[in-house]
Amino acid sequence: MADGVVIVDKPAGWTSHDVVARVRRLAGTRRVGHAGTLDPMATGVLVVGVGKATRLLGYLALTEKVYEATIRLGQSTTTDDAEGELLERRPADHIDEAAVHAGTRALTGVIHQVPPQVSAVKVRGQRAYRRARAGETVELKAREVTVHEFTVTGFRRVDSPDGAFVDVDARVTCSSGTYIRSLARDLGADLGVGGHLTALRRTRVGPYTVEQAATLDELAAEFTVMPLAEAVAAAFPVRRLSAGEARRVVHGHRISPSGHSGPVGLFAPDGRVLALAENRSGSSQPVVVFAGS
């Protein structure tokens, strides 16, 4: 079993757990996990850790994400995406492109966002989606997230027997924990017509891009893993250790602080990745030790 990261281009209709189950079979190990859920409707980058790389996943989940989304204005749904039941329909033919641009600007920066009722957020110890599917009205608290970019890339009017709608294509760069479904819902609400997400593709998680991703069919034909050292060096600053520092780190001991505020990859003189470390109380503390694990 190779330790490392697999960048999967998740197909529509698959849950993130479905992908993990398939990678477990391909890798021949149950020591597999992912670094952040994609909804079944969504496609694109799902970062999967194999072996020792599963210990990276909690840190990779906190990295910046990039999405390409399509939002329909004029319809709201129970799930804030196309998978839910229609709640309300309002004419959107009066909405122009300038109003949409103003709406996306208002949702850019540090914002307080309420997650969708059908989401993995825990409410009193149970996932919100389980409560919602049981018929319970879920009260979710707003959470602070950062939307670095919410750019309109397409604007189309849609006239159908169901009404007059607007479809908006957008690119979103955001912090961990941001729900694109909530952005779609809130953009529609701010414009007074309601909105929901009709398509979503994640194109980047931290440093890992969709251009690097493999489909499940490609992985079945040739299962390739990004080696652990390469995966760490791509995602975090690298610190090269002396032999003495490396010995201390392998045993989980502190070393002198690094010049970085976040996690740093610690590498032995021979190029092996030994650990992730963070500065704590004036020294660099290993928080994940790979050597010997």
From Swiss-Prot:
It comes from the Bacteria. It holds the Pfam family TruB_C_2. The keyword Lyase does not apply. The keyword Isomerase applies. The active site is at D39. Keywords: Isomerase, tRNA processing. SUPFAM superfamilies: Pseudouridine synthase (SSF55120), PUA domain-like (SSF88697). Its EC number is 5.4.99.25. Responsible for synthesis of pseudouridine from uracil-55 in the psi GC loop of transfer RNAs. The gene is truB. InterPro entries: PsdUridine_synth_cat_dom_sf (IPR020103), PsdUridine_synth_N (IPR002501), PUA-like_sf (IPR015947), PUA_sf (IPR036974), tRNA_psdUridine_synth_fam2_C (IPR015225), tRNA_psdUridine_synth_TruB (IPR014780), TruB_C (IPR032819). It comes from Thermobifida fusca (strain YX). One of its GO terms (biological process) is mRNA pseudouridine synthesis. This is tRNA pseudouridine synthase B.
